[in-house]
Structure formats: structure tokens, C-alpha cells
Regions:
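N-terminal pre-ligand scaffold of iron-sulfur
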Residues: 1-60, 92-106
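Short cysteine clusters
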Residues: 47, 67-70
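C-terminal structural segments of small proteins and small subunits
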Residues: 74-94, 99-103
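Hydrophobic beta-strand positions
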Residues: 33, 73-74
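Short linker/helix segments within small regulatory modules
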Residues: 57-64, 86-87
Length: 106
């Protein structure tokens, strides 16, 4: 268990290809780690939909994801729903880079 506020090492920059997403598990919680042209981003690991689909299985286009379970679209950067504003936003988390390493800041 890490101390509160201490960044959690995800991996190395080269571990995640641009335009892709990987699941990252920490303390029994899943996070979706995205590498976009504009940098690294992180959201909760599962969609809020009934299927609770892994967001690491989502389709990515630019800075948006489409849930593989429900088909809803969200901004990866803000977590806001795009095609249905009534939906609950995704939780987003800060990701930092240092010397070729990626860190999740909870």
C-alpha cells in the first residue's frame, strides 16, 4: 500500500502505444490508462453502464472513447459523456511522466 498522495508507478512510457489503452489494477481497483497524441490520461476502469464493461476494451478516436458494452461515448480528457449528457461522467485521474516512467496520481 502506498502513502496517500504518493504517485503509483504504472510502467514505462514505451509500454503503452500511442492511440491505445491499457487496464491497470491497483489495490483491487481497475483504471484505464490512455496514451493519446496529447499525452497520458486515466479514468476509472469500468464504464458506468449496466454491463460494467472494462474501458480498456473501448474503441478510441482522437480524445474520445466508445464503451464496448453500451456504445456510449465519453471524453477521455474530461470524463464527460458526449452522446447522452444525462449519463454520469467517468472519474478521471492525473497521470504524470518522469524520466520515461508513468505515474498515476490518486
Amino acid at each position: 500500500m502506498n502513502e496517500e498522495g504518493e504517485p503509483i508507478h504504472i510502467g514505462e512510457v514505451e509500454d503503452i502505444d500511442k492511440g491505445s489503452v491499457e487496464n491497470f489494477e491497483h489495490e483491487e481497483m481497475d483504471y484505464a490508462i490512455f496514451r493519446l497524441e496529447s499525452g497520458f490520461f486515466a479514468t476509472q476502469g469500468h464504464c458506468n453502464c449496466r454491463e460494467q464493461a472494462f474501458l480498456s476494451e473501448a474503441s478510441i478516436e482522437d480524445e474520445e472513447l466508445e464503451c464496448a458494452g453500451c456504445g456510449n461515448t465519453y471524453s477521455i480528457v474530461s470524463g464527460y459523456p458526449i452522446n447522452d449528457e444525462e449519463l454520469q461522467s467517468l472519474k478521471i485521474y492525473d497521470v504524470s511522466e518522469d524520466d520515461g516512467n508513468i505515474y498515476l496520481n490518486l
